[in-house]
Amino acid sequence: MAAIQVKLVRGLAGCPAAHRTIVAGLGLKKRDSTKILPDTPQTMGMIAKVSYLVEWERVDQPAPEGRKARKAKAAARQG
């Protein structure tokens, strides 16, 4: 599955509160922070709404696993 790399290129000062919420939903906190997200219509819709704040590109790297999957793997490793 393809993934999308999103980078916050502008600060959030002066942005509407709704756009700040969307950026937080993408997992971006500070300027120049980067996240790799799954390529879904929901993600692309969020990116479209804040396109003036972010840059994005498709990458072949798989999207990171969810928190539950990581915890399950860690528990399996510990025995």
Curated annotation (Swiss-Prot):
The keyword Ribonucleoprotein applies. GO terms for cellular component: large ribosomal subunit. One of its GO terms (biological process) is translation. Keywords: Ribonucleoprotein, Ribosomal protein. The keyword Nucleus does not apply. Signal peptide: none annotated. Belongs to the universal ribosomal protein uL30 family. This is Large ribosomal subunit protein uL30.
